[in-house]
């Protein structure tokens, strides 16, 4: 809410509170709907998401304009246009028994007609059109329809099979259990027109059965005979019991009764009133007056050598180290004294989540402000510098997980909402476009679901819900989205799951994806180059014949290479051309390309069969992460090992390529536990937490 100033509460809707606010940038009054998502059911979340989705599609002067949505204090905030003239229902109520002029009725009616025509043109059903949802400008001359919470966007189906809306405006076919379609909105339009002409509802009764009986029989009092026969006939046609007999919107707009009012709308609304009477263009002809949107469980305590300890200086709550990208040894990143519980590395991003739920970012300082310059005669580049900052603009939002792709970031809140920001290339942000976004923005298509995890590849995203539903979006070539095609998508698509498999965790690679299921098995899709997904059907130490090699999978497929196909796997990660997995017993397996020794075997073998990493047999491993041509593994006691390509500091040591695991030394003087590790391209990010020697209370 940094961009807005609350003025007062103007209403309480079905799902939350409506605030009148001042937008600081231009001093414009706006309406902000505050919807407490933590108290909402899945259906209520879907309605809130639906209103955002519908309003973004619409752009019409007679439809309430949508500005943005964001999270604030555990609530979804939807900013939209403010209509200060109140509702049409209030306008009618204030008339008491003083009937409106027919010209005024038509002035309002044709604006509603234009708005509904715009809505239907976008294949949207309003489904709750009523005078309470029709708003007026400050002069009470311009009509704007709003409240699209239960609207229906029609895609492949032409009808909405749910009965919703206000009972007094429900059509006869809905009372019979038939589907809702455009003609049901036209019935509601007829109810609104009747209300304008009679100052009362067409159908009212003491109870619901009596109301349904009236609607089914089409029983309503005729409107006053002071109105033209054409207007009375229009009301009757709109309230025809048979949907087929109700005229379509285009026919209504073409009626002589409406044409003049429509012309006046386009010529008079917004015109400046003259102080003197206008002269007639033709003598003798009077002028018509103007119409009034952690990759694994933590490792246990790492025991460091017991040296002299200065108790006066307490250890930091946690430390985050980075190496690679020119950093040859682990660099402790600057940060406030807070505990970072999970980290994620992208092509250029370094991000973490604190225990208090804040998103922290590490960035290089602006050019010329840090890092020093290379002095004459120097043989080494100066140590790169980083500055930390908390992501601003998300007050009241608790982040519990972050994932990074190439130039974009996704984060998950404690309320199961996914937000993305950064580069919109390939549709990675999931907002239905390729537009870049600088601030975290809700992925509205997933508001109806409680999400529990999100993973980012270089150019695609997987997200998992609490009910085991899987969604994918972004670049799709190679089948990396698991949708059975190679098509790309810029908004979330539900992924079909293998029957009997319950997804527990998702992992994304450069051009592939994996799912860990509840029995500890793995499903994979995308590029299987070098058998980096383990999809080849292989027995132990067996090599496949060329025609048995699987090059790609368009849908999620169980692993076929022994021993991965029968081991219980706790952790997997995907590199550019290789992958690694940790079993329930703590063994570490690698598979894929071994060009740079990233598989951790004594020889640079060329094989498509998975192998167990050598040198780690006596150590129980709990985490593993893969970079472009190297691997990092974490032991149960906090040991950190790396192997593979050593260029530009990938291994966190000042040495060349290492085909076997070697330890990485961290600058820690207190016992610690590794809480999270993430590798991307040539970079590694690792978080550790200090462990005190005090006994843990029972």
Swiss-Prot record:
EC number(s) recorded for this UniProt protein: 2.7.11.1
RCC1 repeats: 415-466, 467-518, 520-571, 585-636, 638-689
Region (Disordered): 281-307
UniProt-annotated catalytic positions: 128
Any one Gene Ontology BP term: regulation of hippo signaling
GO molecular function, one term: ATP binding
Domain Protein kinase residue range list: 4-258
UniProt keyword annotations, A-Z: ATP-binding, Cell projection, Cilium, Cytoplasm, Cytoskeleton, Disease variant, Kinase, Magnesium, Metal-binding, Nucleotide-binding, Phosphoprotein, Repeat, Serine/threonine-protein kinase, Transferase
CDD domains, per database record: STKc_Nek8
Catalysed reactions, as listed in the record: L-seryl-[protein] + ATP = O-phospho-L-seryl-[protein] + ADP + H(+); L-threonyl-[protein] + ATP = O-phospho-L-threonyl-[protein] + ADP + H(+)
Primary enzyme class: transferase
Binding residues annotated for ATP, in chain numbering: 10-18, 33
Cofactor annotation: Mg(2+)
Phosphothreonine carried by residues: 162
Subcellular locations according to the entry: Cytoplasm; Cytoplasm, Cytoskeleton; Cell projection, Cilium; Cytoplasm, Cytoskeleton, Cilium axoneme
Predominant place of localization: cytoplasm
GO cellular component: a single term: cytoplasm
Assembly, per entry: Interacts with PKD2; may regulate PKD2 targeting to the cilium. Interacts with ANKS6. Component of a complex containing at least ANKS6, INVS, NEK8 and NPHP3. ANKS6 may organize complex assembly by linking INVS and NPHP3 to NEK8 and INVS may target it to the proximal ciliary axoneme. Interacts with ANKS3.
Protein family (similarity comment): Belongs to the protein kinase superfamily. NEK Ser/Thr protein kinase family. NIMA subfamily.
Purpose: Required for renal tubular integrity. May regulate local cytoskeletal structure in kidney tubule epithelial cells. May regulate ciliary biogenesis through targeting of proteins to the cilia. Plays a role in organogenesis and is involved in the regulation of the Hippo signaling pathway.
Protein name (database record): Serine/threonine-protein kinase Nek8
Organism the protein comes from: Rattus norvegicus (Rat)
Source species taxonomy: Eukaryota, Metazoa, Chordata, Craniata, Vertebrata
